[in-house]
């Protein structure tokens, strides 16, 4: 049997691609080395931020706005436990922060609903937050957070119900190209398709060693908090930059635990066994202390944490391109720790590729050729 599309890696982007391509009427095979959602990639830990006024550059804004529409659609499948929670996101940092300047520029260019507050305004609205006098806050009312594992579980279930074939707990060991299309090799045998999408995340270089992707071990942790820090008390999700440039992100508390992580830093790794569990690196439990001590002093001790991986490109922008020399294989990789919010739209882009549809987006900034 020859599929229209084989998806290699069915975590964030792959789960979305499987659903959107199957819904479009294609004969699709989703594959994964594990059983998604799982703990081996970049999607576990329950929640991920979604920000619209994008500090990483305005080129992402059209993508994230379409992503939001798709997240809203997906949330309707889980109305009791919605996948998207519109908590708002407060971006905190020094008034001269480059990241915040990019947030403001993105908001202005795309007429997004962003409110600017000075230090006193921030602390008046959220008394739990402490910032220096030279800090500002850019509050995105319409942003919030996503339930990442629930999203993947929902896409996989919807794809299966729509007739998608799924081969999980079965690593792809090689990809071959010939005049008839693409063949993947697995322990379960070989499978053929007209087209393939490679969104294998952290260990994509096991299949395609020439790709400029560097895995980095990252951690996030949950700290003791109370109802003041919850969505019910209108406490927002947040990003925060310290005076030394370190970037943090976090979420409203749930079940008396507030989740926070540090975006920069981490440990460069070269194999899966180097991604040791949380607390096996001495700094894991204390990584968020500088932010908590200065910005959220009412938060208590570390309760538990988890390790994940970023698949970093050299410039930390995404790689969305066909495999050089093989126009029937699309790469979506190098998401560099800020990709989950885009999973819905990237899955749709992958489904369009499989149908030979031209993308609605300018993907030029994400081409591999920028590294040559």
From Swiss-Prot:
InterPro entries: FAD-dep_OxRdtase, FAD/NAD-bd_sf, Me_Trp_Oxase_MTOX, MTOX. Gene3D superfamilies: D-Amino Acid Oxidase, subunit A, domain 2, FAD/NAD(P)-binding domain. GO terms for cellular component: cytosol. Binds 1 FAD per subunit. FAD binds at residues 4-34. Its cofactor is FAD. SUPFAM superfamilies: FAD-linked reductases, C-terminal domain (SSF54373), FAD/NAD(P)-binding domain (SSF51905). It comes from the Bacteria. One of its GO terms (molecular function) is flavin adenine dinucleotide binding. It is an enzyme of class 1 (oxidoreductase). Keywords: FAD, Flavoprotein, Oxidoreductase. Pfam families: DAO. It catalyses: N(alpha)-methyl-L-tryptophan + O2 + H2O = L-tryptophan + formaldehyde + H2O2. Its EC number is 1.5.3.-. The modification S-8alpha-FAD cysteine is found at residue 308. Catalyzes the oxidative demethylation of N-methyl-L-tryptophan. Belongs to the MSOX/MTOX family. MTOX subfamily. Monomer. This is N-methyl-L-tryptophan oxidase. It comes from Escherichia coli O17:K52:H18 (strain UMN026 / ExPEC). The lineage of its organism: Bacteria, Pseudomonadati, Pseudomonadota, Gammaproteobacteria, Enterobacterales.
